[in-house]
Every structure is written in structure tokens, then in C-alpha cells.
């Protein structure tokens, strides 16, 4: 297995572990796991997959759990995700699913 694949696998494991740890209530340990995953990503020059990149706050490294550490709002087809720890906001444009109800 290539080294970059091993690094990516470890990054994913750390982010998953951080999410589980945050659910149990230990946010400080969860932040440390995410910081470590970010460090692996930078040192190994490996991109964090988009699915996992969206799982944590980029300002305070807190795992985003809806209702616990994150608030979600939809305003005019824009999803606004707000970290409840540091008030960092990220906006995503909501688009129609590619395969559903296409008009010909």
C-alpha cells in the first residue's frame, strides 16, 4: 500500500474517532484528534476527502454535530451551518438532485 493511501486512511480514522468522542461529550479530545488529522494531511500532502472535511469547524476544530455543536438553517436555497462554539459560519448552495424529477 502506498504511503499516501495509509495517511489518508489514518486521517479518516482520526476524524471518525473525533466524531465518536465528541458524541460522548469529550470535545477537547475530539479537537486534538482533528488537529492531528490536519497535521497528517499537511505533512503528507494528502487532501482530506470532502465528506470528512465538512464534519468539523475549520476555525476551532470542533466536530460539527447538529443540535450539539452546530446549528443548521436554510434561507433561500442556501444552507448555513454555524458552529455553536466559535460562531464560525459556512454557506452551501442547495441544488436540485441530478436524478430526481427532471422535466423534459
From Swiss-Prot:
Its EC number is 3.1.26.5. InterPro entries: RNP4 (IPR016432), Rpr2/Snm1/Rpp21 (IPR007175). Coiled coil: none annotated. Consists of a catalytic RNA component and at least 4-5 protein subunits. Its main location: cytoplasm. GO terms for cellular component: cytoplasm; ribonuclease P complex. Pfam families: Rpr2. GO terms for molecular function: ribonuclease P activity; zinc ion binding. Its cofactor is Zn(2+). It is found in: Cytoplasm. Belongs to the eukaryotic/archaeal RNase P protein component 4 family. One of its GO terms (biological process) is tRNA 5'-leader removal. Keywords: Cytoplasm, Endonuclease, Hydrolase, Metal-binding, Nuclease, tRNA processing, Zinc. It catalyses: Endonucleolytic cleavage of RNA, removing 5'-extranucleotides from tRNA precursor. The keyword Ligase does not apply. It comes from Saccharolobus islandicus (strain M.16.27). Signal peptide: none annotated. Part of ribonuclease P, a protein complex that generates mature tRNA molecules by cleaving their 5'-ends. Binds 1 zinc ion per subunit. It is an enzyme of class 3 (hydrolase). Zn(2+) binds at residues 57, 60, 83, 86. Transmembrane segments: none annotated. This is Ribonuclease P protein component 4. The keyword NAD does not apply.
